[in-house]
């Protein structure tokens, strides 16, 4: 799929997720087969640009793949300024957030709350597109409530404003992440515009990915929560799309390598004083399958030192490997 002059290596995109899709996670998703990874949301409010959190989020240079940066806000001038400063910092695509359903974002009339105001949407899109010389994309939901699905109207407006690709999450703002995503609206949007359409929502495995592409006619898929603790999902899906065959489960040793490598990158990126806190949620996601009783995760979350985290993970996987060998030995002797 092409967005402006950028050719993606495949049709799988890692979704922007606040507090998750930082540089270490984006780099890992890219290595695991994502055709593009979009940055976590950056506020257009200039008052927060100088904070440590924003400073780290605005590091875009020397990153693998196409550097797509998402911005959020409701003031057209602020959004234009945010787009310019991120392009100056290395962004190659600007993505506009009109899909976030979080209350703290919607209270500021940002995210999916904007879908109620098409005129303001139009002003924001024009301002950002005119402000930068890189492609601008848009992420939305199907509407702000089940009885107010206006994604086709917004999609047509976006195309008229110069938006070069549109991502649609298959729920309304009111739905949050409850219930199942629906794809009829995404299919209707695909049939109503000529710009690339990216389907998002509940794409959790290779079979679902194939089904959503076939049903909606979308040009690409955006995967978010399903990649938490499982960044290799991009490789799994791409292999299935290419061959019709499923990859075998990732070996435990490879899970260990990826997890510990990810945690080391988090420690390095945020500093050991903060990195160990960021690492906790990622470890919890990685180990959902291997530590279902939560005992190790509770123990891990009490650790307040980066090096101790790595030691605990090494010991955990060593113990898990021994248990697996004993189980296999007992099975062979039966």
Curated annotation (Swiss-Prot):
FMN binds at residues 16-18, 70, 139, 200-202, 224-225. Pfam families: Dus. This is tRNA-dihydrouridine synthase B. InterPro entries: Aldolase_TIM, DUS-like_FMN-bd, DUS_fam, DusB, DusB-like, tRNA-dHydroUridine_Synthase_C, tRNA_hU_synthase_CS. GO terms for molecular function: flavin adenine dinucleotide binding; FMN binding; tRNA binding; tRNA dihydrouridine synthase activity. NCBIfam families: nifR3_yhdG (TIGR00737). The active site is at 100 (proton donor). It catalyses: a 5,6-dihydrouridine in tRNA + NAD(+) = a uridine in tRNA + NADH + H(+); a 5,6-dihydrouridine in tRNA + NADP(+) = a uridine in tRNA + NADPH + H(+). The keyword NADP applies. Its cofactor is FMN. Its EC number is 1.3.1.-. Signal peptide: none annotated.
């Amino acid at each position: 799929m092409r967005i402006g002059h950028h050719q993606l290596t495949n049709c799988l995109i890692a979704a922007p997720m606040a507090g998750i899709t930082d540089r270490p996670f984006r780099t890992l998703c890219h290595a695991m087969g994502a055709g593009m990874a979009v940055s976590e949301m950056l506020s257009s409010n200039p008052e927060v640009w100088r904070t440590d959190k924003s400073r780290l989020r605005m590091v875009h240079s020397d990153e693998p793949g196409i550097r797509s940066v998402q911005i959020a806000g409701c003031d057209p001038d602020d959004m234009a300024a945010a787009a310019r400063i991120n392009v100056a910092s290395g962004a190659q695509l600007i993505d506009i957030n009109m899909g976030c359903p979080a209350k703290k974002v919607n209270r500021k009339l940002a995210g999916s709350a904007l879908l109620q105001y098409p005129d303001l949407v139009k002003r924001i899109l024009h301002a950002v597109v005119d402000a930068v010389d890189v492609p601008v994309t848009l992420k939305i939901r199907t509407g702000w409530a089940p009885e107010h699905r206006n994604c086709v109207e917004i999609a047509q407006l976006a195309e008229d404003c110069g938006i070069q690709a549109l991502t649609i999450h298959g729920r309304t703002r009111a739905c949050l992440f409850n219930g199942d995503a629906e794809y009829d609206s995404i299919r209707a949007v695909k049939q109503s515009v000529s710009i690339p359409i990216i389907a998002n929502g509940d794409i959790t495995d290779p079979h679902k990915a194939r089904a959503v592409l076939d049903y909606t006619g979308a040009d690409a898929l955006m995967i978010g929560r399903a990649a938490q603790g499982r960044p290799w999902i991009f490789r799994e899906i791409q292999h299935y799309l290419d061959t019709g065959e499923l990859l075998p489960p990732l070996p435990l040793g490879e899970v260990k390598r990826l997890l510990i490598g990810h945690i080391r990158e988090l420690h390095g990126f945020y500093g050991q004083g903060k990195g160990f806190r960021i690492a906790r949620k990622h470890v919890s996601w990685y180990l959902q399958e291997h530590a279902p009783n939560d005992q190790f995760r509770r123990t891990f979350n009490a650790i307040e030192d980066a090096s101790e985290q790595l030691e605990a993970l090494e010991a955990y996987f060593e113990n898990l490997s021994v248990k697996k060998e004993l189980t296999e030995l007992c099975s062979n002797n039966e």
